[in-house]
Amino acid sequence: MHLFDRRQALAAAFATWPLTNLLGQNQTKDPYADGKLIDGEPPLPVSGSFTLAVLPDTQNYSERFPATFLAQTQWIVDSHEKRNIAGVLHLGDITNNNRPVEWENAQRAMRQLDGKVPYFMCPGNHDYSEGGGCKDRTTLLNNYFPMSEYRTRPQFGGAYDKEPDRMENTFHTLQVADRNLLVLALEFGPRRDVVRWANEVATKYPKHEIILITHAFIYSDDTRYDWRKYGANQKWNPHAYPVAKATQDDVCDGEDLWNLLISKHENFILTLNGHVLNDGLGKFISKTPGGRSVPQILVNFQMRPKGGDGWLRLLEFNKDRQTMEVYDYSPTRKQLNVSEQNRMTLTLAGI
């Protein structure tokens, strides 16, 4: 089956499954029919490389399966030395309904990393408004991950200059394996003035390799979110949410961010997002005006049994400074998924 056909089939299957199936109850179909699972952990990285761990869409763990969330971050702590895990990237939808009990579960899981592995977070649509409805920009994120705790950490670089005491839009720097990295974490559907600030950050750090994390950027058909071109044919575009209507469409999707931010600089090396259902996976590579190829990656496991089955993504940056190994591993299943969408080697453009 061709890749696009496979995705269409998966999308149709997920569309007809009841929610209880997605959360691991009453399943009658094989949830890993599209996978290639093998037992064990990824091979240990070679000396001189480093790893970033990616946690997408933990909303179901925060709501219903907190033990899985705890198992993920504990595995990262237990593995960070032998794998040289330099940081953890959370891609948003930290919670499902923006409720205190869910934030408490998320806080408990992420706090296991404190003092061991730095972590960087961006909010998703479910982290906003009462019930996670994303009707406005209100969120409990700052109640449980307050700026006062993060601004003194050595990796912290700064926050959106109009909201210096809030965590929705931040950047962080890492020096690892003789490389200078900058993680730029932006809110769901970033506001235009947030993008203005992000441009200033990218300009200020021209020698840093920038990784953008934001909740919605590319879609599961391997294209960027583009409201003007696709409209509602790409589900869950930030422009389609109540917050857009409430703010005179002051939101940016993936195409907006490419045109207004990434394409204006030659130091972005990678984008990462979650958010999208269907098969929850995607990859899109496009060139900047300077001819540099920038991989854009979608990863989301929330449709798997038990809210995600513990899957996380490991990005191993090779010492050649040109390639990155991608592994999907579940600490709770103690398995790898080595299908073509889950295990790959990507080329990264230097700066």
Outline where the language-model segments fall.
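A short C-terminal boundary segment appended to hydrolase-like catalytic domains
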Residues: 46, 306-351
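N-terminal active-site segment of His-dependent metallophosphoesterases
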Residues: 26-102, 232-233
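Active-site environment of divalent metal-dependent phosphoester hydrolases
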Residues: 61-63, 96-99, 123-132, 167, ...
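Conserved beta-sheet core of the metallophosphoesterase superfamily
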Residues: 121, 237-242, 246-316
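Residue-level marker for buried hydrophobic side chains located in beta-strands
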Residues: 52-54, 88-90, 121, 212, ...
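Active-site-proximal segments of metal-dependent phosphoesterases and phosphodiesterases across multiple
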Residues: 196, 205-268
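Extended active-site neighborhood of metal-dependent phosphoesterases/phosphodiesterases
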Residues: 30-37, 100-197, 204-209, 237, ...
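N-terminal secretory signal peptides and thylakoid transit peptides that target proteins
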Residues: 1-17
